[in-house]
């Protein structure tokens, strides 16, 4: 389960705008920018509140970086005005047209990729959706040098096509089998089939099945090239023993083609049931026989029912795999040579919770990883950049390079020429922030914050950043996402800004004409911990008045609602238009505050995080007379929908009057195995069946009686199945408890096709609950 914010951009918008502006509009127009900021400061414009329709449209989306580094000095991207594929030289600040848009005129292009040598253009078209990340497309290859087109797989829909590094060779996957395509100098290609046992929907080679795509790889690829492209590691998933989820697709109303509903079947392992059998294979692509080598899992450590959590290449000769036991509290990092022999291992065991390891980085005789380390405080351990000596020895020496109460969220790059490692982390004691830091690879100096010195056009220091480094770390794109609208710049490795890519002048101009909510951050002590709270207040807030409050909850393990990203979605509408206080609460189980608070949720989902939402809300009502305790509601989506329903079921003192659960989990026995067992263990009497039963909302419906409750779900949800809401609805109906229910026919988890109806439905619900006038 991925927090909805991961695919909902700016709170309520369920698509990602991939396009960026043309080169002309990326250049900073200082006069325009100064004029916009002067207008904001001078309050010269009449300002309007946000309207509901802007919650689900692209009106207040920020443009971001849409390029790809192809060398340490060049970026390739699409000019959205002309459709040309351009190359930008960041040193010379010069544009070159690589491919004219006319090359793609005959196709509705949804994907393209240049080959590493720049001769061929891979063009994907005729898109068909797979799961969350996967898609099926037809592909052609355009020969830029000779001008011809070549269909891949005779124009059939394929699941994946990817260029090999350094060469003009290609891997593609058709019907869950892997094919290797090589091109000669005259443009002709030769195709070899690598695997022969793929079965659509059952046995997957090189692409993940549903649960691995959703919960492990968070993407649609399960192939890993060696750095020179000569070898390929690929994962296979055998789902023959995995049980199926079945739901009906009803189709278009009145369409004779849909006279009978269509059955949709997906292999979907639920908690405690059979998982896919995963294997990892290595093949030498330059061997005419394509001989395969099995990279065996360390079953003596992780067991036979294991999870392949990550794969990467260390160098030309070694591939690394991370294998976990089924419940994911033990991980073995294994180094294999090209003959399939295990040459090194590293164990990571977590006794208080679960193991979470991301990519490793290498420098000389050391490996760098993100790992929990003691902080010397009551907060427990934090994820830090940790250096290991991976030379052969019985007990590798480790060094914590980033000590203290700072949470490293990801390692981004190593600059080998300067001996520094770059990473994203919170500031000390600032869990809502994320900045780019660097530290020497030997730990000889304290970390330095790189992005903290970047100022937004409004004059504020950047407090939430991301970075995309060039292949060898000589340049990087710095994306400042908050506290103000996004800015994007290109920097060299001395941190000198060499180009301003995007300043979002249009968005800033529109915001100058809008009322913005006031923001109040505070900590509230409840249940032995300090929970962080962010309140969005109406722009014309008056302490002498009383306002309804709406708590928006997610509260999934290791997530945070409160982050310093500038966004203008549903909360902006509710505060400026409906005069409702909008609240986020990050309590126990949330990220960035140390292992003690994080692991409080372990093996007991639906308990401590729910209790904190209730307790903190009660304290807020007691602290601030301007919060109307008789007009307080809660809503959430996915895990947040589960929490919304559980909050109403556990709220015995009427802290909340009403709530909405969108696409909720109602019982963890219905959700997928890899996510659920990571946090809950197994639903068996020997393990944690009692924990599962105790967190089943359908077993606790009696205390929802008397509260306004709305249950919303799409019948085509392949992630949190409609079964979850139907089970909860059945329990409510059996108990004769009144509630409202909305079913969105054939809609998936994001309800993308019905957003206007969804938000208008919720608006009417809050109007009734909070005694507001109905919006027009």
Curated annotation (Swiss-Prot):
One of its GO terms (molecular function) is serine-type peptidase activity. Residues 1-19 form the signal peptide. Its EC number is 3.4.14.5. It catalyses: Release of an N-terminal dipeptide, Xaa-Yaa-|-Zaa-, from a polypeptide, preferentially when Yaa is Pro, provided Zaa is neither Pro nor hydroxyproline. Keywords: Allergen, Aminopeptidase, Disulfide bond, Glycoprotein, Hydrolase, Protease, Secreted, Signal. Glycans are attached at residues 44, 66, 329, 504, 577, 693. InterPro entries: AB_hydrolase_fold (IPR029058), Peptidase_S9_cat (IPR001375), Peptidase_S9B_N (IPR002469), Serine_Prot_S9B/DPPIV (IPR050278). One of its GO terms (biological process) is proteolysis. It comes from the Eukaryota. One of its GO terms (cellular component) is plasma membrane. Belongs to the peptidase S9B family. DPPIV subfamily. Venom dipeptidyl-peptidase which removes N-terminal dipeptides sequentially from polypeptides having unsubstituted N-termini provided that the penultimate residue is proline. May process venom proteins into their active forms and/or modulate the chemotactic activity of immune cells after the insect sting. This is Venom dipeptidyl peptidase 4. It comes from Vespa velutina.
């Amino acid at each position: 389960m991925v927090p909805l914010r991961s695919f909902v951009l700016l709170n309520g918008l369920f698509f990602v705008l991939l396009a960026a502006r043309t080169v002309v509009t990326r250049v900073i127009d200082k006069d325009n920018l100064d004029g916009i900021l002067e207008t904001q400061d001078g309050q010269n414009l009449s300002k309007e509140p946000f309207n509901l329709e802007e919650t689900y449209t692209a009106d207040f989306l920020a443009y971001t970086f849409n390029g790809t580094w192809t060398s340490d000095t060049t970026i390739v991207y699409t000019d959205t005005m002309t459709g040309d594929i351009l190359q930008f030289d960041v040193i010379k600040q010069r544009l070159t047209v690589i491919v004219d848009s006319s090359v793609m005129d005959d196709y509705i292009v949804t994907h393209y990729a240049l080959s590493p040598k720049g001769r061929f253009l891979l063009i994907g078209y005729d898109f068909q959706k797979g799961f969350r990340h996967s898609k099926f497309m037809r592909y052609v290859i355009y020969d830029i040098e000779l001008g011809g087109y070549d269909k891949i797989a005779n124009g059939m829909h394929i699941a994946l096509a990817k260029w090999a590094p350094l060469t003009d060779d290609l891997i593609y996957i058709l019907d869950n089998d892997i094919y290797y395509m090589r091109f000669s100098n005259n443009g002709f290609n030769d195709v070899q089939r690598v695997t022969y046992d793929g079965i659509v929907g059952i046995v997957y080679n090189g692409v993940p099945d549903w649960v691995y795509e959703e919960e492990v790889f968070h993407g649609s690829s399960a192939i890993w090239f060696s750095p020179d492209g000569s070898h390929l590691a690929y994962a296979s998933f055998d789902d023959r023993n995995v049980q199926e989820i079945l739901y009906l697709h009803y189709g278009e109303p009145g369409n004779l083609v849909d006279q009978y509903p269509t059955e949709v079947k997906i292999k979907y392992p639920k908690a405690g049931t059979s998982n896919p059998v995963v294997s990892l294979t290595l093949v030498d692509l330059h061997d005419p026989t394509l001989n395969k080598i099995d990279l065996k899992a360390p079953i003596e450590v992780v067991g036979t029912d294991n999870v392949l959590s990550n794969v990467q290449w260390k160098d030309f000769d070694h591939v690394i795999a991370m294998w976990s036991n089924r419940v994911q509290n033990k991980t073995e990092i294994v180094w294999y040579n090209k003959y399939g022999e295990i040459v090194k291992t590293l164990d990571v065991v977590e006794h208080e919770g679960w193991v979470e390891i991301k990519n490793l980085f290498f420098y000389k005789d050391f490996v760098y990883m993100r790992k929990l380390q003691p902080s010397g405080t009551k907060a427990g351990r934090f994820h830090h950049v940790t250096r290991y000596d991976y030379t052969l020895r019985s007990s590798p020496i480790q060094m914590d390079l980033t000590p203290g109460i700072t949470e490293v969220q990801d390692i981004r790059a190593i600059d080998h020429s300067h001996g520094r490692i770059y990473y994203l982390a919170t500031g000390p004691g600032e869990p809502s922030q994320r900045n780019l830091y660097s530290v020497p690879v030997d730990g000889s100096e304290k970390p330095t914050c790189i992005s903290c010195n970047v100022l937004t056009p409004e004059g504020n220091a950047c407090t939430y950043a991301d970075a995309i480094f060039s292949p060898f770390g000589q340049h990087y794109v710095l994306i400042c996402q908050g506290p103000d609208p996004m800015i994007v710049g290109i920097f060299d490795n001395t941190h000198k800004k060499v180009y301003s890519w995007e300043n979002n002048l249009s968005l800033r101009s529109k915001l100058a004409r809008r009322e913005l909510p006031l923001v109040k951050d505070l900590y509230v002590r409840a249940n032995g911990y300090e929970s962080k709270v962010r309140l969005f207040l109406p722009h014309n807030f008056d302490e002498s008045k009383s306002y309804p409050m709406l708590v928006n909850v997610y509260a999934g393990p290791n997530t945070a609602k409160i982050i310093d990203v500038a966004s203008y979605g549903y909360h902006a509408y509710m505060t400026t238009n409906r005069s409702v206080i909008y609240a986020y609460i990050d309590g126990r189980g949330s990220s960035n505050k140390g292992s003690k608070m994080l692991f409080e949720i372990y093996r007991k989902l639906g308990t401590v995080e729910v209790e904190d939402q209730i307790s903190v809300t009660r304290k807020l009502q007691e602290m601030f007379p301007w919060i109307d305790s008789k007009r307080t509601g809660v809503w959430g989506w996915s895990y947040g929908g589960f929490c919304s329903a559980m909050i109403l079921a556990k709220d015995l003192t009427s802290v909340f009057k009403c709530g909405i659960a969108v696409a909720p989990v109602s019982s963890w026995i219905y959700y997928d195995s890899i996510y659920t067992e990571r946090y809950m263990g197994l639903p068996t009497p020997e393990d944690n069946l009692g924990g599962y039963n105790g967190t089943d909302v359908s077993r606790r419906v009696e205390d929802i009686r008397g509260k306004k409750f709305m249950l919303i779900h799409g019948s085509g949800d392949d992630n949190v199945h409609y079964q979850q809401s139907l089970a909860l609805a059945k329990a409510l109906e059996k108990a004769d408890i009144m509630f409202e229910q909305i079913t969105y026919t054939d809609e998936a988890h994001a309800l993308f096709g019905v957003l206007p109806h969804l938000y208008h439905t919720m608006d009417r619900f809050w109007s009734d609950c909070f005694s507001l006038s109905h919006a027009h």
